[in-house]
Amino acid sequence: MNEPGMRKQTRRSFLAACSAAGVAAALPSFYVHASDKSGARAPVVGSGQHTYECIHDWLMPPEGMVWGDTHGLCQDEQGLIYVGHTVHKSSMRGEAIVVFDEKGRFVRAFGEEFRGGAHGLKLRREGKTEFLYHCDINRCKVVKTTLTGEDVWLHGYPREDANYMERPIDFVPTNVAFAPNGDFYVGDGYGSNHMLRFSLDGKFLGEIAKPGHGDAELDNPHGQWVDPRGEKPLLVVADRGNRRIQTFTLDGVHLKTIKDEAHLRMPCNFQTQGEWMVCPDLDSQVCILDREYKVAAQLGDGKAENGEVGSRRDQSRAQFTPGKFITPHDAIFLHNGDILVAEWVPIGRITLLRRT
C-alpha cells in the first residue's frame, strides 16, 4: 500500500518509466502529444443546465503505474476519489485501486489482488464507517473492504441458489447496489445474468430476475442503482445486453421496461444526485436521465465517429476525437456536481466533465 506524500507521476516521468520497461511504443500517443499545457481550451459538451467542460485524462496514475481498463469509480464522504482498473500488463506497479483527492492528486493505492479483475466499485456508509464493495471478475467474487483495502469479507456464488450448483463458474458479478435497509443487490452480468439479493451480513435472500429478453428478464445486468428520487425507492437495472433499463420494487416486482435506442444504447451503470441520474453508455456517450428515465442530455456522443461499439478502443489517443467518448463504463457525480467518467479502453481514460 502506498501512503500520501508519494509524488504524482508527470507525463515525462511516465513515458520514461514505460520506455525503460520497453513498452513506450504501445502507449497511447496522448502521453507524447498531450496538449494540456499548450493553452488549448478543453471542448464543451452538452447544453443548457447540462453543459460541461470536457477534460480528458484528468486523473493520471502514479509513477510506475500504467492504467489498465478503467472500470469503476466512487467518492467517499471526505471527497477522496477511488478508481478501479485492471492494471496494464506493462505496469511496474500492480495495485488495482487508486485513490486521489478532490483536486486530482494521488493519495494512495492498494489491491494488487484485484489486478485483472477490478470491475464494479461502490461505497456505502454502515453506521459510522464507510466500506468499499468490489466486484472481481477474475476471482469471481464480491469483496467488501475498508477504504484502505483491508478485507472484511469475500463472497463467491450463492450456494443456496440451485442455478449455480452444477455450474458455479457461471458466477461473474459485475456490480452492486444498496437498499436503505442494508440489503444489497448483485448483478451477475458476466455470468448467469441473474440479479441476486443479499442481506447486510451477506445472507442470500433470493433472485430478483432471471435471464432472457422479456420484461423482468435480463441479458448482462451490468450495473444497478437504488433510485431514491420518487415516492418509494426503486431498483434500476442497466440491462445492457438488451439495450434497455428495467425498474423493480426493492422486493423484486417488475415495474417498467424503458427502451429508447435512439438516445440510450448500452447503459452500464447509474448514480443519482438531486433530481438527475447519470448513466454511462458503453456505446460512446454519457447520458443524463430525468425522474422518468428519459434522456435529458447526451454528453460527448461519439457514435458517429466510433461506429461499432468498441471498434476504436485500441486506437491511440491521437485518433480519439476531443470531446467525444469511446466506451464509457462508469460515471459518478462528484460532490460539487461535476461528473467523472471511466472508460473501457486500454491504458484507461478518466475524464472530468466540469460544470460551466
What would you call each of these model-derived segments?
Residues 35-54:
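Blade/loop signatures of beta-propeller domains
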Residues 1-9:
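N-terminal secretory signal peptides
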Residues 56-92:
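Beta-strand-rich domains and repeat architectures in extracellular enzymes and scaffolds
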Residues 81-82, 131-133, 184-185, 234-236, ...:
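Conserved beta-propeller blade signature
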Residues 59-64, 110-114, 153-167, 205-216, ...:
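Surface-exposed loop and turn segments in beta-propeller and other repeat-based domains
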Residues 10-25:
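N-terminal export leaders
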Residues 327-356:
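Blade-level signature of beta-propeller repeat domains, shared across WD40, Kelch, NHL, RCC1
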Residues 66-78, 114-128, 160-183, 213-234, ...:
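Beta-rich, blade/repeat-based domains predominating
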